[in-house]
Swiss-Prot record:
One of its GO terms (cellular component) is plasma membrane. It holds the Pfam family RhaT. Keywords: Cell inner membrane, Cell membrane, Membrane, Sugar transport, Symport, Transmembrane, Transmembrane helix, Transport. This is L-rhamnose-proton symporter. Belongs to the L-rhamnose transporter (TC 2.A.7.6) family.
Length: 344
C-alpha cells in the first residue's frame, strides 16, 4: 500500500472522528430549542467556514464561481440539498427506530448507495468487476457493511440491557424514513462527484491538491443549508412552544455560552468534510468513490470508540462491548482490504 493511499485512509479516519464527536458541544447547550442550536451551528459549518476558507484559498473568489455555467453548479447544489433532506430524516429515523437500528439501517444504505452509485453513474462499474483491484475494493465494501451490521447489533444489545427504547417506536414509518435517509444522505457523495470540474478549476488556479475540493463546499453545503435552516426557521415560526426571540432573551452569559458551544459543534461538523477533502485527494482517481465508504464506515467505528471513552457502555455488560469490539475490528479489516485493492 503506497504512502499516499495510507494517508488518504488516515485523513478519512480523522474526518470521521470529528463527525463522531461533533454533537458533544451541542449536548452542553442550555435552555435553547434544538432548532435554534442547530441553526447557529449550521450557519457556522455550512456558510461561514466554507465561504471563509474558499476566500483564503482562491486568488479571486467571485471570478472562480462566475466561471462555471449553471449546468455545472446546479447538480452540485441540488445534490447538496439532497444531502440536507437526508440530514433531517436522520433525526426522525432515530425517533421511530431507536439509535442502533436507525443508525445501522441508514448508514448501511447510504454506504452502499453513495459508494456504488457513483461508478455506475460514471459508466465505469465494469472496472470494479473486471479488475483484481476493483473486486478487492468491492470485497472491502461488503466487509465494511458487515462491520456496520455487527456494531448495530452491539447497540441493540446495549439498548436492551439498559432498557433504552425508541421515543415513538414505529417499525413501518421508521423503515421508510431510514431508507429515505440512507438514499438522500448519499447526496454528499454524488455532489463531490458532480463537483469534479470545480476541483479541476481550483487546481488550475494553483490551489494545493489537498484543498481543491474545499471551494466546492460553498455550493454543496449551500444546498444543504437551505434545507436544514429552512426546516428550523419554519418550525421556529410555526410551533407554539418554540421561539427564537425567547432563546435570545436569556441572560447574556448564557447566550454567549450557547453560541460558543453551538459554533464549536459547527466547526467540528465542518472539519469532518475538511479532512474528507484531504483524504479524497489522496485516493487514486479511479477509486475516488471509495472515499464515501471509508468515511461512513469510519464514522461508525469512531462512534463506537467515542461511546466507550465516554463510558456510555459501562452498564451494558460484557457481551455488547465484545460484539462492539468485533464490529470495530471488522471495519478496520475492511479499510485495509480497500487499501490493498486501491494499491493493486
Amino acid at each position: 500500500m503506497s504512502n499516499a493511499i495510507t494517508m488518504g485512509i488516515f485523513w478519512h479516519l480523522i474526518g470521521a472522528a470529528s463527525a463522531a464527536c461533533f454533537y458533544a458541544p451541542f449536548k452542553k447547550v442550555k435552555k435553547w430549542s434544538w432548532e435554534t442550536m442547530w441553526s447557529v451551528g449550521g450557519i457556522v459549518s455550512w456558510i461561514i467556514l466554507p465561504w471563509a476558507i474558499s476566500a483564503l484559498l482562491l486568488p479571486n473568489f467571485w471570478a472562480y464561481y462566475s466561471s462555471f455555467s449553471l449546468s455545472t453548479l446546479l447538480p452540485v447544489f441540488l445534490f447538496g440539498a439532497m444531502w440536507g433532506i437526508g440530514n433531517i430524516n436522520y433525526g426522525l429515523t432515530m425517533r421511530y427506530l431507536g439509535m442502533s437500528m436507525g443508525i445501522g439501517i441508514a448508514i448501511g444504505i447510504t454506504l452502499i448507495v453513495g459508494t456504488l452509485m457513483t461508478p455506475i453513474i460514471n459508466g465505469n462499474f465494469d472496472v470494479l468487476i473486471n479488475t483484481e483491484g476493483g473486486r478487492m475494493t468491492l470485497l472491502g465494501v461488503l466487509v465494511a457493511l458487515i462491520g456496520v451490521g455487527i456494531v448495530t447489533r452491539a447497540g441493540q444489545l446495549k439498548e436492551r440491557k439498559m432498557g433504552i427504547k425508541a421515543e415513538e417506536f414505529n417499525l413501518k414509518k421508521g423503515l421508510v424514513l431510514a431508507v429515505m435517509c440512507g438514499i438522500f444522505s448519499a447526496g454528499m457523495s454524488f455532489a463531490m462527484n458532480a463537483a469534479k470540474p470545480m476541483h479541476e478549476a481550483a487546481a488550475a488556479l494553483g490551489v494545493d491538491p489537498l484543498y481543491v475540493a474545499l471551494p466546492s463546499y460553498v455550493v454543496i453545503m449551500g444546498g444543504g443549508a437551505i434545507i436544514n435552516l429552512g426546516f428550523c426557521f419554519i418550525r421556529l415560526a410555526k410551533v407554539k412552544d418554540l421561539s427564537l426571540k425567547a432563546d435570545f432573551s436569556l441572560a447574556k452569559p448564557l447566550i454567549f455560552h450557547n453560541v460558543l458551544l453551538s459554533a464549536l459543534g459547527g466547526l467540528m461538523w465542518y472539519l469532518q468534510f475538511f479532512f474528507y477533502a484531504w483524504g479524497h485527494a489522496r485516493i487514486p482517481a479511479q477509486y475516488d468513490y471509495i472515499s464515501w465508504m471509508l468515511h461512513m464506515s469510519f464514522y461508525v467505528l469512531c462512534g463506537g470508540i467515542v461511546g466507550l471513552v465516554l463510558k456510555e457502555w459501562n452498564n451494558a455488560g460484557r457481551r455488547p462491548v465484545t460484539v462492539l469490539s468485533l464490529g470495530c475490528v471488522v471495519i478496520i479489516v475492511a479499510a485495509n482490504i480497500v487499501g490493498m485493492g486501491m494499491a493493486n
